[in-house]
Amino acid sequence: VQQRLPSRIDPPITFAHRGARAHAPENTLEAFELALRLGASGLESDVWMTADGVAVLDHDGVVKKGLRKRPISEYERADLPGHIPTLLELLQTCGSSYSLSLDLKDPDSAESIVEVIQGVDSTLLERTWLCEASLERVIELREIFGDTPIRLLQTTRLERIKGTPERRAEYLARHRIDGINLHRTDWNGGLVALFHRF
């Protein structure tokens, strides 16, 4: 029997990945609302920016119309299918009494996302986790946000880390990055314990 490692957050956050996607279409307001009703304490989604600068929640970041697929960034919000919610619609519909994990798919979206959250409930910033793939950009975001109480994570895969995981953990901690967002198959007890040390 594998021993369960203690959580550094009590109680641990149970993020609903793209909402309750086993019971409702993923990344829809219906899926997010249902996830919270089913007991999730956090919601997770990818965030894309539209051509007119609106943060929307979707996994693939493309819209299929007929036989054509086009990136969300080429559409204005009004031209997107209705099932794709904006970040603002999520907050207006689901409130702000949960943790929020957002994977940034547009490198320049973080500031807009923080503005939306602050405009609805600035206390949610303390429970918001922004995940950025670029190591350089996540460090830049810490400099931009300074002491703003927002959590910043680098998203990567274990195989992409140059050097050892311990060096990466130390590097992130030195730059005040709150953690790392690895794929679930990359994690094991040793890595959890290692990153908890920093």
Which ranges hold each PLM region?
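Phosphate-group recognition and catalysis centered on beta-loop-alpha active-site segments
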Residues: V1-F198
